Curated annotation (Swiss-Prot):
Entry superkingdom: Eukaryota
Organism, as annotated: Populus euphratica
Entry similarity comment: Belongs to the jasmonate-induced protein family.
Protein name per UniProt: Jasmonate-induced protein homolog
Length: 18
């Protein structure tokens, strides 16, 4: 999980995938 990569409408969702 890389929270720093979180972007867009769903930062939490993006961070979870990364």
């Amino acid at each position: 999980i890389d929270a720093s990569t979180a972007t867009g409408d769903s930062p939490v969702f993006t961070a979870t995938i990364k």
